[in-house]
UniProtKB/Swiss-Prot annotation:
Changing K6R: Decreased acetylation and reduced H2AXK119ub ubiquitination. Changing Y143F: Displays a reduced apoptotic response. S-140 phosphorylation is reduced. This is Histone H2AX. A motif ([ST]-Q motif) lies at residues 140-141. There is a cross-link at K14, K16, K120 (Glycyl lysine isopeptide (Lys-Gly) (interchain with G-Cter in ubiquitin)). Changing S140A: Impaired phosphorylation without affecting H2AXK5ac acetylation. The modification N-acetylserine is found at S2. The modification Phosphoserine is found at S2, S122, S140. The [ST]-Q motif constitutes a recognition sequence for kinases from the PI3/PI4-kinase family. The modification Phosphotyrosine is found at Y143.
């Protein structure tokens, strides 16, 4: 009888991470540890790191989606800092959120003030209508 081990005992369930329970890719346990070690508050609730990890994951996915579109527009398959810069600065809400952030190697948005653009020449304007009493019935030649 001896040496047979425990019989009828319940097998312990496989460990499941808090990230997988919440359906997230970002690490809930690491966020919890960082919240505790950062001394932001004396105590940290169980839901706080899950919520914060979800917010961080959403923001990251949003930025990467826009940066991927910018990379595709430039016919590239790899996202570089320039694509991140274009994605953030062209989006009104992300630009407001990350207004004080400098992205290394990001460059600037292409922007030329309207007053600096060359003026339209008189050659592009069609001939004036005759000043006689009759109105011109000719169709405009401007394209």
């Amino acid at each position: 009888m001896s040496g047979r081990g425990k019989t009828g005992g319940k097998a312990r369930a496989k460990a499941k991470s808090r990230s997988s329970r919440a359906g997230l890719q970002f690490p809930v346990g690491r966020v919890h540890r960082l919240l505790r070690k950062g001394h932001y508050a004396e105590r940290v609730g169980a839901g706080a790191p899950v919520y914060l990890a979800a917010v961080l994951e959403y923001l990251t996915a949003e930025i990467l989606e826009l940066a991927g579109n910018a990379a595709r527009d430039n016919k590239k398959t790899r996202i570089i800092p320039r694509h991140l810069q274009l994605a953030i600065r062209n989006d009104e809400e992300l630009n407001k959120l990350l207004g004080g952030v400098t992205i290394a190697q990001g460059g600037v948005l292409p922007n030329i003030q309207a007053v600096l653009l060359p003026k339209k020449t008189s050659a592009t304007v069609g001939p004036k209508a005759p000043s006689g009493g009759k109105k011109a019935t000719q169709a405009s030649q401007e394209y």
